[in-house]
Amino acid sequence: MYKGSIEMSTPMLYAMAFIGLFTIGGLTGLFVAALGLDIHIHDTYFVIAHFHYVMVGGMVTAYLGGLHFWWPKITGRMYPEAPAKLAALITFIGFNLTFFPQFLLGYLGMPRRYWAYPPEFQVLNVLSTAGASVLAVGFLLPLLYFAWSLKYGEIAGDNPWQATGLEWETSSPPPTHNFHEIPIVTKDPYAYGEDQEVPVVH
């Protein structure tokens, strides 16, 4: 992305969130893998936070980015961009508010799978619970605007992202077998910014 021409569309916001969250999940895996430290944090909330930064912060966030990217091609309709960006932001904030306090709880010695805990853990547990509520809103919003877009969304067009891949040269949604005849590719699939010529000849 450095020195690139980046458009902060909803899929890009989810992609950037994926990079950040998955990086935190990966780096905290080093702590879990270090024997001396793992003796202290094993079976604590630190492990819970690490797991969720990898699996939810990584995989689910990437899935949401991909879903937003492909939605126009799948349905032929655009979703409203403003609520989608808001949902991406709410998801990112809610996720970190839910799971980052769990790193601290685990480091301070709170074991997982316990429903009762000493009073000193109360504030961080309340923060984590509040974050889960925010995260739930972030996950529910796409269901609403995706459903809305199926009927009221703007017509997407064949290539709403100005992408250069072959899949964006067919209609949205694509017909059976994508193309009626085999297309002839006339330019590189990653030739962004060179010209505005059509990359295939039908």
Regions found by a protein language model. Name each.
Residues 1-14, 31-47, 62-88, 101-123, ...:
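Juxtamembrane membrane-water interface segments of multi-pass membrane proteins
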Residues 18-23, 87-100:
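Hydrophobic alpha-helical membrane-insertion segments
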Residues 23-29:
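Acidic/histidine-rich
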Residues 49-57:
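Membrane-interface loop-to-helix entry segments
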Residues 52, 93, 103, 143:
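Divalent metal-coordination and catalytic microenvironments
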Residues 59-67, 136-139:
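Hydrophobic alpha-helical transmembrane segments
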Residues 111-120, 149-202:
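Extramembrane terminal tails and long inter-domain/linker segments of multi-pass membrane proteins
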Residues 118, 122-135:
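Contiguous transmembrane helix-bundle modules in multi-pass membrane proteins
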